[in-house]
């Protein structure tokens, strides 16, 4: 699916043209949508679809005329119990004129911008949009980590009584989620570090405070994840 937005008179508006100041939002895009965006913006189709590959690693690369940024964002595993998540790539492509986001699924990280739930958001402020996406992703990790911790505590209360195989399986799934999160958050932190040092990407002084906030939130999410992994260690022998 492809939707195109542009901030006009401080309002987010759906538009049809891929012109300056627009945000092209691709969710599980069709081949035709990929070809159309690639041809219009002179972008390699492989760079557009990269983020739809669940195995794609977080990275940043400077291409001829555009920049590719890929980060990992959390998403709930379909059909799984509460607190069981995985991560999927979110692609962000920056050209001189506009920004493109690509993801294999609908997520709140992107959806909150389309629903106008993010203050100070403008499609015309590309780097600020990137930082806002990373900030939203970091805070979502923290939100999901709190859910994981609550679910872990609820399960471990049962360990003093009858131990069920389903409880052990769920604890293992929660632990796997924490490992996914730790790996993805570290990769995102590396991308952010590189992002701040690329001179090609225009940075504005007003965005510095937001950038600092993103760095703090990612670090906090990493610390929360590592702390929960450590807390889970005493019950790990029960799942072997």
Please name every model-derived segment.
Residues 225-229:
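C-terminal amphipathic alpha-helical segment
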Residues 230-240:
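Single conserved hydrophobic/aromatic residue that forms the stacking wall/gate
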Residues 1-206, 210-213, 217-224:
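Peripheral, non-transmembrane regulatory/ligand-interaction domains of membrane transport proteins
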């Amino acid at each position: 699916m492809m939707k195109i937005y542009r901030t006009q008179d401080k309002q987010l508006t759906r538009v049809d043209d891929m012109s300056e100041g627009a945000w092209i939002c691709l969710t599980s895009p069709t081949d035709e949508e990929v070809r159309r965006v690639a041809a219009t913006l002179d972008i390699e189709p492989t760079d557009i679809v990269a983020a739809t590959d669940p195995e794609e690693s977080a990275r940043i690369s400077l291409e001829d005329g555009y920049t590719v940024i890929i980060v990992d964002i959390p998403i709930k595993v379909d059909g799984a119990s509460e607190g069981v998540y995985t991560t999927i790539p979110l692609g962000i492509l920056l050209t001189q004129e506009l920004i493109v986001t690509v993801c294999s699924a609908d997520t709140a990280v992107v959806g909150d911008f389309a629903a106008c739930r993010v203050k100070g958001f403008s499609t015309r402020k590309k780097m600020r949009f990137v930082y806002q996406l990373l900030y939203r992703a970091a805070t979502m990790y923290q939100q999901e980590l709190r859910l994981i911790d609550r679910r872990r505590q609820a399960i471990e209360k049962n360990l003093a009584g009858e131990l069920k195989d389903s409880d052990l399986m769920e604890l293992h799934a929660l632990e796997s989620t924490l490992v996914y999160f730790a790996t993805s958050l570290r990769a995102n932190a590396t991308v952010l570090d590189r992002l701040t040092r690329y001179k090609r990407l225009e940075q504005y002084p007003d965005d510095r405070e937001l950038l600092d906030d993103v760095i703090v939130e990612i670090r906090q999410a990493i610390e929360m994840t590592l702390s929960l992994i450590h807390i889970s260690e005493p019950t790990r022998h029960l799942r072997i």
